[in-house]
Amino acid sequence: MRFFLCSIFMMISPIWPLGENPLPGDPYVIVNKRTNELAVILDNKVEGVYSVATGKTDDLTPEGEFSVTVKAENPYYRKKNIEGGSPDNPLGARWIGFDAKGTDGRIYGIHGTNREESVGKFVSNGCIRMHNDEVVHLFQTIPVGTRVLITDDNRSFEEIAIEHKALIKKQDIPIE
């Protein structure tokens, strides 16, 4: 009977990944609101650090660990009915949406901009803005499911990544 109940439960329950998340080597994104920088962790190293814009006030850009749920090229701006690719579109060249505050990845995201001069400043309504060429690179680098950590921290990206198991310290790497 126990076997039967366990079998039924396994068939109707979602399949969860086994082990730690992220796995060593998986892409991982860290946004530091204190410095307005974004780091990409890839293959156990910081692959790149980019200047970004975050919320006008500290509470607008949510903090926590989220997952990329949607990606779009030349995203449509629904709020003002602006087609993707338009020079008037504030979302720029790419949209990388994540599930902050229980949303579906269409409210909060990392995106390009039509105001390149705003990058590096505290000016957004909660999203993370990047230069268009840099968000295109990020878009190509990270898949849906990538973890995104948004924090306000005075530590280095390496220290933050080690704490969140996105980087393994050299002495912790097993020798085969």
From Swiss-Prot:
Matching CDD domains: YkuD_like
EC number: 2.-.-.-
Pfam entry (one): YkuD
Gene Ontology biological process terms in this record: cell wall organization; peptidoglycan-protein cross-linking; regulation of cell shape
Residues at the catalytic site: H111, C127
Alphabetic keyword roster: Cell shape, Cell wall biogenesis/degradation, Glycosyltransferase, Hydrolase, Peptidoglycan synthesis, Signal, Transferase
SUPFAM superfamilies, alphabetized: L,D-transpeptidase catalytic domain-like
Similarity-based family: Belongs to the YkuD family.
Stated name of the protein: Putative L,D-transpeptidase YqjB
Species this protein is from: Bacillus subtilis (strain 168)
